[in-house]
């Protein structure tokens, strides 16, 4: 995806996240909401995978499609909603194949997670920061990046073999 499409796909969640941050933080963090959305996303993913006709490739993505996928990503602001799963659902509904849907979810993860982290740092009490916390955070970020880089290839291979069914079952049990 080009930078323009990444910005378009990231804008809705950043916009709605900024507007509804306080409401979400104070009103939607109950165990009931989290459980309901954990199960609901699994069931929606099941239906989309079962009924989807997924032929489009990531190279076919339009600005409108990436904006719609970005709007789907906004649903992930609700606790219990997997950001990756909701993007995959949106992409599958628009006719993209599994591999492209996963790649779109992974590409859109970076700006959103980075900006969310920066916003949380902005809200953080800086008196609590010390060199130990900073060094451990940097190590965690580097390790996460490296592990993610190697897992992505396996994940795409695995999903193409099994589909999303193991993850649906996991989410239903978890919910």
What are these language model-derived features?
Residues 1-175:
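Multi-pass membrane proteins that catalyze or facilitate reactions on polyprenyl-/lipid-phosphate substrates
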């Amino acid at each position: 995806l080009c930078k323009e499409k990444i910005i378009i796909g990231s804008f809705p969640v950043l916009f709605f996240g900024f507007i509804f941050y306080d409401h979400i933080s104070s009103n939607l963090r109950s165990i009931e909401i989290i459980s309901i959305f954990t199960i609901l996303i699994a069931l929606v993913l099941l239906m989309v995978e079962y009924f989807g006709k997924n032929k489009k490739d990531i190279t076919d993505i339009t600005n409108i499609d990436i904006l719609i996928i970005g709007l789907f990503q906004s649903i992930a602001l609700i606790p219990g909603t997997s950001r990756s799963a909701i993007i995959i659902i949106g992409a599958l509904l628009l006719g993209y194949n599994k591999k492209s849907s996963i790649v779109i979810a992974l590409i859109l993860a970076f700006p959103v997670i980075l900006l969310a982290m920066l916003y949380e740092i902005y809200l953080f009490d800086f008196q609590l920061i010390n060199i130990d916390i900073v060094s451990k955070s940097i190590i965690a970020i580097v390790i996460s990046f490296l592990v993610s880089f190697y897992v992505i290839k396996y994940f795409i291979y695995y999903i193409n073999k099994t589909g999303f069914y193991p993850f649906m079952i996991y989410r239903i049990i978890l919910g």
